[in-house]
Amino acid sequence: MKQVVIASRESPLAMWQAEHIRARLQALYPGLEVSILGITTQGDRILDKTLNKIGGKGLFVKELELAMQEGQADLAVHSIKDVPMDLPEGFALAAICEREDPRDAFVSSRYASLSELPAGAVVGTASLRRESQIRARYPHLLVKPLRGNLQTRLRKLDEGQYDAIILAASGLKRMGLAERIRMELSTADSLPAVGQGALGIEIRADRTDLMALLAPLNHPATYACVTAERAMGRALGASCQIPVGGYAEQHEHMLVMRGFVATPDGTTLLHAEATAPAEYADALGRTIAKKLLDQGADDVIDAVKAAG
């Protein structure tokens, strides 16, 4: 194989991620020509509505999959948290790279933490998962939708439209903006999204040549953790329309995982935790989902969908 084309969203963060994978591939295979095909996805174009109102995170990946299907690109680089739990038939995740910081970050010009915000302060987030956890812990705060790429969200904060915003720490760090983080929220305070902080490389399932080429980029511990998280999400029928979080960590050969399902207003928050050997990652995720369903998660999910 002499050349590879990477499909990527055109936001600065997405292009950084694609450039990162390009650099890693060229370091591994010095003779390989790697180019990037930038694509503006539907999710990037529709910015006046929240994702749960316009079809969810699949809007960020469909055009990239089409480019692979039509032979314009060989692979696509995604933030795993933006990838639907079920890939379309004919596609596969060839590699999941080592995870960056999975935590949520508190960003504000005036305040050092969520606990410092006064009653009625406006917090911006694009995520129902973040909203539900903030409203459960800080019911006196006002949570408002926040769309746009990373730079747009920071600009809206700086213009005074919000008192604080919550973003993925990994994105800020990858873009060299770690100094904007006032506080990283612990995973106990804000359980991350499924796959948060990890990059995934998607290919057509019939491209066995690419599967071998990309194998060195796969990080086994991250792959196991994300496999467990996505198995939980799949079993719950999770999407960005439902406040769901899942986070697994590997300690030696064991995975420790926590998951939650909530209502957006934070009045109902169901938690579950379990442990399993890393080779049973998929089963661990399904165990977490079952524990949540046994607590009534299906009723919560149905109620959120009906209200949606």
UniProtKB/Swiss-Prot annotation:
Which positions does the record annotate as the modified residue S-(dipyrrolylmethanemethyl)cysteine?
Answer: C240
Which branch of life, at top level? Bacteria
Q: Which cofactor does the UniProt annotation name? A: dipyrromethane
Gene of origin? hemC
Q: What is this protein called?
A: Porphobilinogen deaminase
Q: Which GO terms describe its molecular function?
A: hydroxymethylbilane synthase activity
Q: What does this protein do?
A: Tetrapolymerization of the monopyrrole PBG into the hydroxymethylbilane pre-uroporphyrinogen in several discrete steps.
User: What additional remark is attached to this entry?
Assistant: The porphobilinogen subunits are added to the dipyrromethane group.
